[in-house]
């Protein structure tokens, strides 16, 4: 099919064009020029209703997360729950809001070393028990009628070690320049 376009020239956005498509264009000696897709930049611009909903949904979700965090901090160190229970507890706090429909993606609820596994998912009925003095990662989001959230936090029940503090601060320093780009 591409041979039909020999001698033609195409505009492609390197940020959204799959490598397979670019390779096919090169292989068939079809000329192309890079442009930034104008649609992508227009999606970033939000109207007043979208801006209002964005603020509102993050207030709802933030309140649910604060309640979850407060619950987490008040747990007795001898009576902690597992990763699955914690994910369900956050869902419970979000569910109080009548605009909440579901999680926006499966919650990553990871304790200790599990927090370093990319897109970790606890096994139903086999999730790790949360204990004091270790890091707990929760990456979750809510799907509300007026918007979607995505929140990642690292919590600890008890005291972090000096090593944890050093590594965590190093990560923040590394990611800070990237955050400013957004």
Predicted regions and their residues:
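Flexible, acidic/His-enriched mid-domain "rim/lid" segments that flank
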Residues: 1-100, 112-114, 155-169, 179
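Buried hydrophobic positions in well-ordered alpha/beta secondary-structure cores of metabolic enzymes
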Residues: 54, 109, 133-138, 171
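Internal maturation/activation junctions in enzymes
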Residues: 104-106
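Conserved beta-strand/loop block within the catalytic cores
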Residues: 108, 114-117
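Acidic/histidine-enriched ion/cofactor-binding microenvironments in catalytic or ligand-binding pockets
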Residues: 116-146
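A glycine- and small-aliphatic-rich helix-loop capping segment at beta-alpha/alpha-beta transitions
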Residues: 123-129, 153-160
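Single conserved hydrophobic/aromatic residue that forms the stacking wall/gate
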Residues: 173-182
């Amino acid at each position: 099919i591409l041979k039909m376009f020999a001698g033609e020239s195409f505009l492609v956005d390197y940020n959204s064009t799959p490598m397979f498509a670019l390779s096919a264009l090169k292989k068939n000696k079809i000329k192309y020029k890079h442009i930034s897709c104008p649609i992508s930049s227009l999606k970033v611009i939000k109207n007043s209703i979208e801006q209002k909903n964005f603020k509102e949904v993050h207030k709802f979700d933030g309140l649910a997360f604060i309640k979850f965090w407060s619950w987490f901090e008040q747990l007795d160190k001898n009576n902690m729950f597992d990763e699955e229970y914690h994910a369900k507890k956050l869902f419970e706090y979000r569910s109080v809001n009548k605009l909440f429909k579901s999680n926006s993606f499966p919650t990553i609820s990871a304790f200790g070393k599990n927090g370093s596994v990319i897109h970790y998912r606890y096994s139903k009925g086999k999730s790790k028990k949360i204990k004091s003095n270790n890091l707990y990662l929760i990456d979750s989001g809510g799907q509300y009628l007026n918007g979607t959230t995505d929140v990642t936090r690292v919590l600890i029940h008890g005291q972090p070690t000096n090593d944890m503090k050093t590594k965590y601060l190093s990560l923040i320093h590394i990611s800070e320049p990237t955050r400013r780009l957004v």
